[in-house]
Swiss-Prot record:
<keyword id="KW-0804">Transcription</keyword>
<dbReference type="InterPro" id="IPR051362">
    <property type="entry name" value="WD_repeat_creC_regulators"/>
</dbReference>
<keyword id="KW-0853">WD repeat</keyword>
<feature type="region of interest" description="Disordered">
    <location>
        <begin position="477"/>
        <end position="510"/>
    </location>
</feature>
<dbReference type="GO" id="GO:0045013">
    <property type="term" value="P:carbon catabolite repression of transcription"/>
</dbReference>
<feature type="repeat" description="WD 5">
    <location>
        <begin position="530"/>
        <end position="567"/>
    </location>
</feature>
<dbReference type="InterPro" id="IPR036322">
    <property type="entry name" value="WD40_repeat_dom_sf"/>
</dbReference>
<dbReference type="GO" id="GO:0032153">
    <property type="term" value="C:cell division site"/>
</dbReference>
<dbReference type="Pfam" id="PF00400">
    <property type="entry name" value="WD40"/>
</dbReference>
<feature type="repeat" description="WD 3">
    <location>
        <begin position="372"/>
        <end position="411"/>
    </location>
</feature>
<feature type="compositionally biased region" description="Polar residues">
    <location>
        <begin position="496"/>
        <end position="506"/>
    </location>
</feature>
<comment type="subunit">
    <text>Interacts with creB.</text>
</comment>
<comment type="function">
    <text>Component of the regulatory network controlling carbon source utilization through ubiquitination and deubiquitination involving creA, creB, creC, creD and acrB. Required to prevent the proteolysis of the CreB deubiquitinating enzyme in the absence of carbon catabolite repression. CreB deubiquitinating enzyme stabilized in a complex with the CreC leads to the expression of genes such as those in the proline and quinate pathways.</text>
</comment>
<feature type="repeat" description="WD 4">
    <location>
        <begin position="414"/>
        <end position="458"/>
    </location>
</feature>
<keyword id="KW-0805">Transcription regulation</keyword>
<dbReference type="GO" id="GO:0051286">
    <property type="term" value="C:cell tip"/>
</dbReference>
<keyword id="KW-0677">Repeat</keyword>
Length: 591
């Protein structure tokens, strides 16, 4: 009896990718290329200071799936099986020639805080000889035999391009599906990546550059993946190291990752299981066991059993031979993003449970918990002076919070779908007026201007508003007493309302949701649909505004020639990013 052999596996993109053999014949490797276009007269942004003109649209090529990846079938739209974690295109920008951003004074006038882990001698860095080159990862990513990395493609004239370029030019690192690209945005052929890394199955979800260690011969990049693995990558030498390999410390996806300000080695990663983990790029990993018996963990326990922060390993632990350096459990739901304050003391964390948590991460304490109207919060950023926090979320709103007053300032209404990224424009901020932008799944870019004087609280329920103000003052007085108590003893507030909110063992203030009738509303100064797919990332440069989208469009608008405020001298790489995980609900024309 004649039996036919089974058919070969079918992939989404047949024979488009994968070096190998088919029916005895070699299969060529087909690469997809980035495309750049220069639209003329389209999609300009009109603001009070002038017109922002679209310079170019760089479309990153989406890589085909790896041959070992199972074919993507049409799923049941009603299925409740969670989709694999992914992310739209995010950018990490760096200018080698620019000076490092200096810390700004804190809101209480004390100045920049000490560095994370300074009080622990076990974290003291070994002495380094002056003039010695910075340490690089050990493994060559081009010659790697790891199954985690599929291929690495370098430009044929990469060395010449790096030697001939202007050090003040802008490098960009971008993720798109399982590809990670290193781009030179100052080159004439900016669409040609210097290096493209293709991972086997994992998608890089978030990445960051260490501004402290950058030089003409060294750039430290960390990237967190959907598999939970973290890559420390040095592109100049093409060396890399794999941290949290196979999820030995935390096996859930990395949702956000940032270098800790002022540190050469430490970075913080948010995981999808609600944990914040601090890693050291030069330490080995070890199977993690919680240190629940530590004094720090006991300190954060409240008598009501509601602990806003469970310290599974403290930065003050003497056991610092392996990763993690510190590990905190905030919730059982996903941490979507976090941001460090300019004074290097506070940490703003947003979660899928709809909460904004403000931490003093040097003391490992949660100070405030705010709530959205409904749905999760997706993105967060700080004002350049550290006085305000801006968040965006699934309630289609952008919200401004005041750190000194510890309250909501205004709700910003203008998006028609989830807000995926927010960022301040430091070149258009001064002592009184602030400019920030937001993008969302409605394909819109919005610009906002606000000052405290221009915000007016609605007149209804004035008596209740006065009562609420007195409660906030009482809460603020309690926090000030708590901060002044260096011995760690917490005093009970005299206010009965405050006592119901927290107790002597819990310094956290849980703020109730402020009703809409008592919240100021702020309209945008500009609203524009800038593409056909959701926008995932927003960044402000000294000469431009940049966005990136779910399908890989990186758009750049030139600023008007006049009207740039030079009061601030921050690093050119000021950006914000967050995962946008929804399609546009509706689209409207520009306002």
């Amino acid at each position: 009896m004649f039996v036919l052999p089974p058919p070969p596996p079918r992939y989404t993109v047949p024979v488009a990718y994968a070096a190998g053999a088919s029916n005895g014949m070699a299969v060529p490797v087909v690469e997809t290329n980035n495309i750049i276009s220069h639209p003329e007269g389209g999609c300009s942004l009109q603001a009070g200071e002038g017109t922002y003109l679209l310079r170019d649209d760089l479309h990153l090529a989406t890589p085909p799936p790896h041959p070992s990846e199972a074919p993507v079938m049409n799923p049941n739209p009603l299925a409740t099986v969670p989709a694999p974690p992914t992310s739209g295109v995010k950018l990490s920008l760096v200018s080698i020639g620019s000076r490092i951003k200096t810390p700004t004074p804190s809101v209480d006038g004390v100045g920049a805080a000490s560095l994370f882990g300074d009080g622990n001698p076990a974290l003291a860095a070994p002495p380094v000889k002056e003039g010695l080159k910075r340490r690089k990862p050990k493994n060559n990513i081009i010659k790697s035999s790891s199954s985690f990395v599929s291929r690495v493609i370098t430009h044929e004239t990469a060395t010449k391009r790096l030697n001939d370029r202007n050090p003040d030019g802008l490098f960009a690192f971008a993720n798109i599906n399982r590809a990670f690209q290193w781009l030179d945005l100052s080159a004439k052929q900016k669409e040609e990546p210097v290096t493209k890394i293709l991972f086997t199955k994992a998608h890089m979800i978030s990445h960051d550059i260490n501004e402290l260690t950058k030089s003409t011969s060294h750039i430290d990049v960390v990237m967190g993946s959907s598999a939970g693995d973290i890559i420390w990558y040095e592109p100049m030498s093409q060396k890399y190291a794999r941290i949290n390999k196979n999820g030995v410390v935390n096996n859930s996806p990395v949702t956000h990752i940032k270098w800790i300000p002022g540190s050469e080695n430490l970075f913080m990663a948010a995981h999808a299981n609600g944990q914040l983990v601090v890693y050291d790029k030069e330490k080995e990993d070890a199977l993690f066991a919680p240190e629940l018996g530590s004094p720090s963990a006991e300190t954060m326990k409240s008598s009501s059993g509601r602990s806003p922060l469970q310290i599974l390993k403290s930065v003050n632990s003497r056991n610092q031979k392996t990763n993690p350096v510190a590990l905190w459990k905030l919730a059982n739901q996903k941490i979507t993003q976090f941001a460090f304050s300019p004074d290097r003391r506070h940490l703003a964390v947003v979660l899928e449970d709809g909460s904004l948590r403000v931490m003093d991460y040097l003391k490992e304490e949660v100070l405030d918990i705010f709530r959205s109207y409904y749905g999760g919060l997706i993105c967060v950023c700080w004002s350049p002076d550290g006085k305000y926090i801006v968040t965006g979320g699934q309630d289609d709103l952008v919200t401004i919070w005041s750190l000194p007053e510890r309250k909501i300032v205004a709700r910003c209404q203008g998006h028609n779908s989830w807000v995926s990224a927010v960022a301040f424009d430091p070149w258009r901020c001064d002592d009184r007026t602030y400019r920030f932008g937001s993008v969302g799944d409605d394909c819109r870019l919005l610009l906002w201007d606000f000052s405290v004087g221009m915000l007016h609280r609605p007149r209804v329920h004035q008596a209740n508003a006065r009562q609420r103000t007195s409660m906030i003052v009482s809460n603020t007085q309690h926090l000030n007493r708590h901060r002044a108590d260096s011995g760690g003893n917490r005093t009970r507030s005299d206010s009965q309302e405050t006592a119901d909110t927290y107790n002597s063992y819990d310094p956290t203030v849980r703020h109730p949701v402020e009703p809409r009738a008592r919240t100021a509303l702020l309209p945008p100064i500009m609203s524009k649909i800038v593409g056909e797919d959701p926008i995932c990332w927003l960044g402000f440069q000294e000469d431009s505004i940049m966005t990136s989208s779910l399908e890989g469009h990186i758009r750049t608008w030139d600023r008007p020639r006049e009207g740039i405020n030079d009061n601030y001298s921050y690093s050119p790489a000021i950006s914000a990013s967050a995962t946008g995980s929804g399609r546009a609900d509706s689209m409207m024309g520009s306002l």
